[in-house]
Amino acid sequence: MTNYAIILAAGKGTRMKSDLPKVLHKVAGISMLEHVFRSVNAINPEKTVTVIGHKAELVEQVLAGQTEFVRQTEQLGTGHAVMMAEPVLENLTGQTLVIAGDTPLITGESLKNLIDFHINHKNVATILTAEADNPFGYGRIVRNQHGEVLKIVEQKDASDFEQQIKEINTGTYVFDNARLFEALKNINTNNAQGEYYITDVIGIFRENGEKVGAYTLKDFDESLGVNDRVALATAESVMRRRINQKHMVNGVSFVNPDATYIDVDVEIAPEVQVEANVTLKGQTKIGAETILTNGTYIVDSVIGERTVITNSMIEESSVADGVTVGPYAHIRPGSSLAKDVHVGNFVEVKGSSIGENTKAGHLTYIGNSEVGANVNFGAGTITVNYDGQKKYKTIIGANVFVGSNSTIIAPVELGDNSLVGAGSTITKDVPADAIALGRGRQINKEDYAKRLPHHPQNK
């Protein structure tokens, strides 16, 4: 049978106290809406309709081209939100999943199981439920002695007996598509909130003697709906625990998983060692046998095999096999480090390519530069790439030796096998195989220091 899906993403999320629509708040690197959308895709829906409202344009940008959108200009309840999908889905045959866009922990496996349960039991409606240790505040699932679902009762309306029920409504449902939109025509706003509730559809089906079932989640965490920053932090914690467990099962070692922060789309090869307080974000990929030490922060970068990154930051860059970075190095966007490069402590590389086996051991800035293989940068080397208005490029050939405390003022080119003397300021091209000396001549004035206040004889 054919599956369809409706994702409810129109709400403002007042309790988030944010200008950002609630469903766009991120969990492990992507928005809650994207998490839900990915899980929904596990049921292979022929059509997915996302209901948007508050700051609809922002929400639409996140899933542009991946779903159909309908607008809920007034937020009049969950039932009203589902009504907005009627022009797209009402005449179709199959079953429709209805899910909130603020449930980032739901898994595709659970949604597939829910759909299968719905079909196998020939239900008109199936409620996704969970067993809560503390069900206070949730709608309870009331069953008869045969285990059949009778109704959903909200906390404020529950009797003392019903309040003891631990099975709760998660707010996710599967409906026979045609019957869903027929029943929606019969719900009203005769309730304390003055809204159209999707749960009223369940009551209509029961009154008609139609079969309503409930499928219970194995993991209560999946039921979490995020309404405030506290729940958002809970979702973040659960998601990161899942992510880290997945990587450990796949052969990655963590010194302290609870203090390691890895986004959902990060890829890590086996035999990688990850120490505490490491953060890996975005589309980062880490090659096999790499070591990431305490304090390393990597964003949208590709790291090769057998690299060692020590307490350093790498952003939007590529690092080849066998490279060592840090401690306290900063590889800024647009940089590439070739095989066996060494970038040491307090070195910054920005928008530059560095050739194989090149070494910048300490206290160096390499910006907007193209650096060949086997180059050595002495401590304190600075490529001066900005004149206050425009940035310029430095080109350094292979096998170049740059002495300590040298300043290379772009645009300039250092030819292959050249040498720059320590303390030089280079403003002109240096030919291949040449030595460049660009510093003032040293002058010694004999006994002159005796005239100065610091000298012992003057104290």
Curated annotation (Swiss-Prot):
GO terms in the biological process aspect are:
cell morphogenesis; cell wall organization; lipid A biosynthetic process; peptidoglycan biosynthetic process; regulation of cell shape; UDP-N-acetylglucosamine biosynthetic process
Cofactor, how bound (note)? Binds 1 Mg(2+) ion per subunit.
Kindly indicate whether the keyword Acyltransferase belongs to this entry.
Answer: yes
Residue sites binding Mg(2+) per the record: D102, N227
Keywords attached to this Swiss-Prot or TrEMBL record, sorted alphabetically, are: Acyltransferase, Cell shape, Cell wall biogenesis/degradation, Cytoplasm, Magnesium, Metal-binding, Multifunctional enzyme, Nucleotidyltransferase, Peptidoglycan synthesis, Repeat, Transferase
Output one GO MF annotation: UDP-N-acetylglucosamine diphosphorylase activity
Per UniProt, subcellular location reads as: Cytoplasm
Q: Which Gene3D superfamilies match?
A: Hexapeptide repeat proteins, Spore Coat Polysaccharide Biosynthesis Protein SpsA, Chain A
Q: Which cofactor does this sequence's record say it needs? A: Mg(2+)
Chain positions covered by the region annotation Pyrophosphorylase: 1-229
Record's catalysed reaction(s): alpha-D-glucosamine 1-phosphate + acetyl-CoA = N-acetyl-alpha-D-glucosamine 1-phosphate + CoA + H(+); N-acetyl-alpha-D-glucosamine 1-phosphate + UTP + H(+) = UDP-N-acetyl-alpha-D-glucosamine + diphosphate
- Where is the segment annotated N-acetyltransferase? 251-459
In this chain, UDP-N-acetyl-alpha-D-glucosamine is annotated as bound at 8-11, 22, 72, 77-78, 139, 154, 169, 227, 332, 350, 365, 376
- Where this protein primarily resides, as one coarse class? cytoplasm
Its family? In the N-terminal section; belongs to the N-acetylglucosamine-1-phosphate uridyltransferase family. In the C-terminal section; belongs to the transferase hexapeptide repeat family.
Tell me the subunit arrangement. Answer: Homotrimer.
Q: State the name under which the record lists this protein.
A: Bifunctional protein GlmU
Q: Which organism is it from?
A: Streptococcus gordonii (strain Challis / ATCC 35105 / BCRC 15272 / CH1 / DL1 / V288)
Ranked from the top, the taxonomy reads:
Bacteria, Bacillati, Bacillota, Bacilli, Lactobacillales
